[in-house]
Amino acid sequence: MWYEKITFLFKNKELRNKLLFVIFLFVVFRLAANVPIPGIGAENLRKFFDQNQVFGLLNLFTGGALSNFSIVLLGLGPYITSTIILQLLTMIFPGLEKLYKEEGEAGRQKFNQYGRLLTIPLAAFEGYGMLTVFARQGIITGLSLPIMLSAILTITAGAMFLMWIGEIISEQGMGNGISLLIFAGIVARIPINIFQTFSSYSPAQIPSYIAFFALSVVIIAGVVLITEARRNIPVSYAKRVRGSKMYGGVSTYLPMSVNPAGVIPIIFALSILLFPGMIASYFGTYAGWVGSAATSAGLFFNNVWIHGVLYFLLVILFTYFYTAVTFDPKTIAENLQKMGGFVPGVRPGPSTAVFVKHILNRVLFTGAIFLGLIAILPSIVAGITGVTGFTFLVGGTSLLIVVSVVLDTVRQINAQLQMREYENF
């Protein structure tokens, strides 16, 4: 069956061209991630990322573009941050919420345009902060005012370029472009992590490696299971007679995912969690109480236990927040009522909205705890097995992005294949 689908995918000219175009954009992204910003010496950068937990996470998030000091060193961070800010603002400004939820595709396009515009100042600000932190710690050299202005413009343009590539990929119908680019960056780091792990290999660690890979298989299977899990709410449609024909009278269900927010909460939480460490690094070189306070704050947020607890709580918070923004039980209930649908044993309208919200909260609790545990898995796995080099494969952002993106892309490609197969009849 899979062989037939793959064969049809490559036989269909339109789908084949879309797939090849997406692969080409991946290549462009990886090339850009290896083009350094001109005029700045960054020889000590890789060593810094190996030793710094906060920036090491950020480097993984950008697919290694940060350690290469490339023109796209910020990755998709500014765009993701602008999305977080706008979605928070929908809860404060009713007009913005109406634009996002009630004005259809045109409203969402306008909302996305606001996100693009907000990305520009955020990218410039983050670029300036990053350059200043590196310069004050002596990691980069040759940072005069003209070169800094040029570098900030380059970094901002790089962030907008990646955002544009992500949107083009999304338009091809092969998956979410932003998630796919992050996925491509993570996959590109796999050979490097494997090499680093085996370069320090010793026969005494064989039991730890076996335990690690066994645990990895179990964790990945659990991620797939939870990602695909659904809670089906039964829905029936009333019978209606029009002329001599009868409509409705069928039963179906409303699928409710255990993990409706997908990978977004982990990405949001990671973006927020990186800020304290970056700010502490920025002010840590100041003299007096400012530098002392920044250093103390940096040590506080770099503590493994504090970092893990904050990460866990932020993921749970953003799971509920993102689901509240994107999934509205009241709208679901109204749409069901308009189409003549109802949940057996529940009154249509407000009662259905309350019922759906109750089920959603119960399901979401399981999904939020699961996401929180996935976020802190690298520390747990490393503590159990003593193996640290491969933790990127089984924990946090890396694991969930890889699994979620693969499953989502396969789903969208299957939908494209089915649509083309129907057209052939």
Language model: regions and residue ranges:
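N-terminal cationic and glycine-rich segments that engage phosphates or anionic surfaces
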Residues: 1-425
